[in-house]
Amino acid sequence: MTRRIDILGAGLSGLSAATILSREGYDVHVYEIRADSGARFDGDFQGIENWTSDTDFFDEMREWGFDPEEFKATPFNIIDLIHPDDVITQPSTDKPAFRVVERGTDSHCIDQGFKRMAQAAGATIHYETRKALEECDIIAAGPKESSAIAFGEIFHTDHPNHVSFQLNDKLAPGAYSYLIIIDGIG
C-alpha cells in the first residue's frame, strides 16, 4: 500500500515537497486555503539570487528534478546600485547574478510552474480547502502575518528590462527601495 502524505500549503515549498514525494511514489495531497497557488501575490516581482554560489541555481534546480523552463525568469548580470549619497554604481557579473520571476496566478508565474510540476508528478491539489495542522505531515502554509509593509506601483513603460536597488533613508528609512522593469511592466 502506498503511503499517503498530506501537505498544508500550495506555495513554492509545499509544491516542491509534493513534486519530490510524488516522484518517489507517495500518494501526495496538498491543501490550500486560497483558490490557486500564488493567489496571495498580485503579479509581484521577486529576485532569485545566483551570486553566492559557483553553481548556477537553475542548474541546481535541474539536479533536484525541477524544470526552470516551466516559468518565466529574466536574468540580470548588472544592476544600478544607488548609494545613500545618490551615487550610482553598476556592479556586474559574467553569469546571471539573479533572475527576476513573477509571483501569482498567471501561467508564466513561478507559482504556476511549480503547480504544473507537482501535478505532472502525480500530486493532488485541493484548493479552497482547510485542513487542520495536526492532520498534515508537512506544514508549508507560509506566513500568518506580514513582517514588513511594502508600497508599490505597477506601471507600463517602453523602458528596457532594468533593475535599480536604492539604499537611501530619504525614500525608505532603515530599509531599501527598488525598481524592476520586465517586458514593459514596472
Predicted regions and their residues:
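Extreme N-terminal starter segment of soluble prokaryotic enzymes
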Residues: 1-6
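Glycine-rich FAD pyrophosphate-binding loop
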Residues: 8-10, 22-44
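Predominantly flavin-linked oxidoreductase catalytic cores and closely associated redox partners
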Residues: 10, 20, 34, 108, ...
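N-terminal Rossmann-fold NAD(P) dinucleotide-binding loop
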Residues: 14-15
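N-terminal FAD cofactor-binding segment of flavoenzymes
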Residues: 35-84
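Short beta-strand to alpha-helix junction loop
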Residues: 52-55, 93-116, 146
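Short acidic-glycine loop/turn motifs at beta-strand connectors
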Residues: 82-87, 182-185
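Short amphipathic beta-strand/extended segments with alternating polar/hydrophobic composition
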Residues: 87-96, 166
